[in-house]
Amino acid sequence: MPSISTNIILAFTTALLGTLIYRSHLMSSLLCLEGMMLSMFILTSLTTLNLHFSLTTMAPIILLVFAACEAAIGLALLVMVSNTYGMDYIQNLNLLQC
């Protein structure tokens, strides 16, 4: 496995561990999720370029669309929680109460 792929997998693992460690704050969780999506995008792009398979060229773009949707929903949820409770603790977030 080339060193670039190893570094990208290490970045994904670090972001995943960051999500597990800093799961009490919503902003930290969102930043770690964005790091995971960025490393997945780079890994998907490199894999697509190395395969030379024309049908997989849309996969990184589709991944970016999902990452943008995830970021928009996450930021909307962050604004809603911080306006309601004044802090971004995930413990305050209970989706069963509307």
Curated annotation (Swiss-Prot):
Query: Any stretches that span the bilayer, and where are they?
Result: 1-21, 26-46, 61-81
Q: Where in the cell is it found?
A: Mitochondrion inner membrane
Q: How does it sit in the membrane?
A: Multi-pass membrane protein
What GO cellular-component annotations does this UniProt entry give? Answer: mitochondrial inner membrane; respiratory chain complex I
Q: What class of enzyme is it?
A: translocase
> What GO biological process terms are annotated to this protein in UniProt?
ATP synthesis coupled electron transport
Q: What does this protein do?
A: Core subunit of the mitochondrial membrane respiratory chain NADH dehydrogenase (Complex I) which catalyzes electron transfer from NADH through the respiratory chain, using ubiquinone as an electron acceptor. Part of the enzyme membrane arm which is embedded in the lipid bilayer and involved in proton translocation.
Q: What's this protein's name?
A: NADH-ubiquinone oxidoreductase chain 4L
Query: Which species?
Result: Otolemur crassicaudatus (Brown greater galago)
